[in-house]
Amino acid sequence: MMRRIAVLDAPTNLGLRPPTSTSAPGCGKAPGALRDHGLLARLRARDAGCLTPPRYDPGDWRPGDGVCHAPEISNYSVALADRIGAIIDRGEFPLVLGGDCSVLLGSALAMHRLGEAVGGRIGLVFVDGHSDFRHPGNASYVGAAAGEDLALVTGRGQADLAAIEGRRPYFRDIDVVVLGIRAQDEYRLDLQAAGITTRPVPALRAEGAARTAQWAHEQLADCAGYWVHIDVDVLDPAVMPAVDAPDPGGIAFAELEILLAGLVDTPHCLGVELTVFDPDYDLDGSYAAEIVNTVVAGLAPVSSPSAVPPRLLPPGPVAPAPRPGNGRAAERTVLPAPAAVPAPAVAVEPIGPALTPDDEHDDDPRRATGAADGPDGAAPAGPTPSTGPGRLRRVPVPNDDPPAEPGEAGPAGTGLDIA
């Protein structure tokens, strides 16, 4: 049974620093630009609407104040998690159009809620040209959530972003796979020390995009499912310069298409988000058109007649359970997924200039300097926990659990296959 795609716009730019003192980042225009090139019609997707972000206004924020726009990002993340949860409750496959990488906080919150509801962990496949792993423990400055999103969703950083609703971390380090960072990423050793699995561009290219997607899936075999984050700056600036921090040494559109198709061609993939495309640097719309072509082809397995949706059904409204303490979830002993057997290397002609060290969104001349983060709070921080949709429960598996009682069947398309 095919899975219906639902496209939700999340046009926030709150996680980026202003390109100049008198302008705002343009990535908030990305959903409109992609829609203008026929994305929804070509995907035959349901229009899930737009979650309008708060105004981009740094106000009197100064270096040393922590992450800029933190209260606004926190509240927006709760609302975005509600919307993503509602899509999943309908048995649909969410495609979230950012916006900057701070949208990952809302997606991560939705996945943590889901994992809690089904009694399992949800993983993250993080496809990005940068590790976005800057945090107070490894840097003298922070300030832009879009350059710190992976750190925040793994529980590092100020509590009003890293522990929304008292949930921390949203993803465990062992449940994260990072693909597409540059070979000299500034925080690659920190990722390794944290136990976060990575495959930089040279290794991704050597193994091939299809095998890399399968390998990523195997790394998360112990999870109930996974979310896919795609920052288009994973692409080489020779083919995709319309981003806030272009960095040489990226992949090609064809590789991204194959990678995306492999990641979503399983009921374990719960949804995808696309971030950081900036139409202000796409004067003729050609890059938007190329992104649409790639996304449509890459998501083809989702809407294939043979696609199998996850095995989850939405219950009635469920209020979040109280979460006492400082928001740090109790650790559970979990064995890591077995590593995949490496496949023979496949030679691929590299594109663009030679690799250079990753500057983590900060040395681009269009950007301002950052600031030091504030200390973590001891108690849960952020907005009031949502009571909206997105709470899902397990349904019986044939030859495993007892059959469902009459009347428990959910909407069409919600019979799934998440282990």
Predicted ranges, named:
Residues 3-419:
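Conserved alpha-helical scaffold segments that buttress catalytic/binding sites
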